[in-house]
């Protein structure tokens, strides 16, 4: 046996270590490979380029509200294929597929809880559920959120992420634009704050109704916000749109939104704004997540 064969015979091949699926992910913007757990701790914001990735509705609400205070509302409401709609696929099959993929019954999740101890009702869209499209259940859950805010005499916060009205429900989905807007009029009559947070993307019938009706309309950085998409507009007007058209930075320059807030700063910023609007003490940034419950503001101010 030659010397090289003796060396080869003593070499033990090593097994390739298998990496569990989902441990690593890639940034949609800069392409940087990121550790999944680190990204979740950073609220789905890329630590390299500050790109705000899409966030599930439940993760968003859990990152906003105080621990142990969350109570889900309207979870019993489920969509039905009343029209027996079919395009390339049956609507009921699309619903079943979306429900299996996301674990949600529909595209809006509503919870009540506390924010730095202040009672609030919060709603968030699940974009992975049929593009966050608004159907009858989304409208009904949003109205339920408004009714709960009125009952508890507390503010309402909604995080929008939607492609617009759900075409599979035809006019029933379009009716939700008026239904949700009418419900918000009751909030205005009572003098209760409604803050709309626009995330990427907020389009179509959602942007044309409750998403732009906030007492404050706040957007995340670089969120796409509008009615029709930029490609549709370019094809219609036959002109090239300006850079960044329909992005939150473009909209704030034109006065269409009130402010842009980075996601890691969103919780404290919302609490600070609502404390001022509700005449409550400013939140303590060092306070534990469970907070200290503040009693609801009475319906009427005491007479002087």
UniProtKB/Swiss-Prot annotation:
Designated name of the protein: Acetyl-coenzyme A carboxylase carboxyl transferase subunit beta
Function: Component of the acetyl coenzyme A carboxylase (ACC) complex. Biotin carboxylase (BC) catalyzes the carboxylation of biotin on its carrier protein (BCCP) and then the CO(2) group is transferred by the transcarboxylase to acetyl-CoA to form malonyl-CoA.
Location of the region described as Disordered in the Swiss-Prot/TrEMBL record: 285-304
Family per record: Belongs to the AccD/PCCB family.
Keyword terms of this UniProt record: ATP-binding, Cytoplasm, Fatty acid biosynthesis, Fatty acid metabolism, Lipid biosynthesis, Lipid metabolism, Metal-binding, Nucleotide-binding, Transferase, Zinc, Zinc-finger
Molecular function terms from GO: acetyl-CoA carboxylase activity; ATP binding; carboxyl- or carbamoyltransferase activity; zinc ion binding
C4-type zinc finger locations on the chain: 27-49
CoA carboxyltransferase N-terminal domain segment(s): 23-292
Organism: Shigella sonnei (strain Ss046)
Summary of subunit composition and partner proteins: Acetyl-CoA carboxylase is a heterohexamer composed of biotin carboxyl carrier protein (AccB), biotin carboxylase (AccC) and two subunits each of ACCase subunit alpha (AccA) and ACCase subunit beta (AccD).
Any Pfam family hit: Carboxyl_trans
Pathways per UniProt: Lipid metabolism; malonyl-CoA biosynthesis; malonyl-CoA from acetyl-CoA: step 1/1
